[in-house]
Amino acid sequence: MTIPTPRKEFSNKSNNASLSIKKLATHLLKLTGNWPKVISGQLCAPDGDGVMPLPDPPCLFAYIDRFAEVKWRRGGVPKAEFFAGLPHNCERYEWASPHPHFPPLPGVYYTTKPPLPANTGKLDELVARFSPATEYDRLLIKAMVLTFFWGGPKGKRPVFAITTDGGDAKKGRGAGKTTLAEVLAGLVGGVIGLQVRASTDRTRAVLLSPAAWGRRVVLIDNLKSYRFSSDEFEGLVTCEEITGHRLHHGFAARPNYLTYVVTVNGASFSKDMAERSVVVKVKQPTTSPTWYADTRALITEHWDEIVADVRWHLVKKPGMKLNGTDRWPDWCRGVLSKTDKPNAALKLTEQRRRAIDADDGDEEDVVDHVRTRIAAACESVDRVVWVPVLLMAKWVMELRRDFTQHQASQFLRAMVPRVFQYHRHSAGTRYYVWRGKEAEPSTPPITLSYEVNNAAH
């Protein structure tokens, strides 16, 4: 007959004397191997390769029961009071992750030990399974994987916009844009899916959820928007800390070590969004019934070798000298320079940013349209012309029929002073000033008139 081994006790009293919260915490941490820890402001316990929150006293004491028999007595520290005081005696971290950063980031608790750096070639083998449009896109896909693991500063990672040229019969559909993002994000726990039209509160609640802690890639999939612009999304990309309301907790924060990915056919972004983006193009792949399973198997079976290769690139491989940088200098130095042809890739990236910048394209169209209107009204564009703001807004709306007058005015204000000069007359009348290329400085201005059609309005 087997005699059961007596369990250790965890009690708020010793020899009938009450124990302080500090002594109880010291005893608990010794029992559990220095757990729980405070992560993102919340008590957490280990859970496989990750962590799980302990949001209330019942959860905490259920966890303690794994290690000792809980005997809580009257007259000692109440459970609720111990739960409230325990965080002050535990190790604190901003974030926890089962996946490494290279170099490791301060304030992040890593629940697993990473492989040593080694030039295994497995990273190139993985990237080679995809269908980049050019050799430079292959390099940018590799840079995207390195970015997932890069231990760089908060909010200093570009958005990766995965798209196609759209010249094939399917117009870019079925090229594997989403598959590229999701499969490679599997190296670091998978994606956090965001909806463009979701509210700010909803978006931040998703990002701050403990279930999202182990994932570090945010995906906006299959974007369908002309001139995609979002103050919220643009702010998320560059902020150092993501703050908001966490369900059943209250105020919460996480450091912004996330990488943002957008998949889109025919990318058309605002200027701010275009400048934040690195455009990666893919082409229609050669179909294979086993490609997906084989690629997933490569990641599952050779994860250590792939990550060892990533670590070698980020920590051991000397970076190539860059001829310049863009708005992401830390990323260029820490990631892009570790690829084979960083200067050529950087030049291509700048070209593609200009190509997807809908603001520049719209501005050129508006200038051409205004030039036509000036020529019709003044017989020559080589003049100085004062155009009333409402008339100029009307001209913009002739070209952009989706604009309201307010939107047209906002668009014009964004163009000033790069294209038109704004002028307010002493009488209070407001104008945009058109100055033709051949107009002399002393050329007297022509003032156009405009009457508001109240009936039409």
Explain the meaning of each model-derived region.
Residues G235-L236, L412:
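Active/binding-pocket-proximal capping segment
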Residues M1-A128, Y136, P153, V206-A212, ...:
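N-terminal nucleic-acid engagement/recognition segments and initiation subdomains in replication
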Residues W95-G214, M392:
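P-loop NTPase catalytic core of nucleic-acid-dependent motor ATPases
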Residues H423-H425:
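Short beta-strand micro-motifs enriched in acidic
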Residues T134-L139, R173-K177, Y226, D382-W386, ...:
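Alpha-helix N-cap/helix-initiation sites
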Residues M144, P153-F160, T164, L187-G235, ...:
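Feature primarily recognizes SF3-like P-loop helicase cores of small DNA viruses
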Residues F130-I141, L298-E305, F403:
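Structural motif
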Residues G121, L139, T178, E182, ...:
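Short, well-ordered alpha-helical segments
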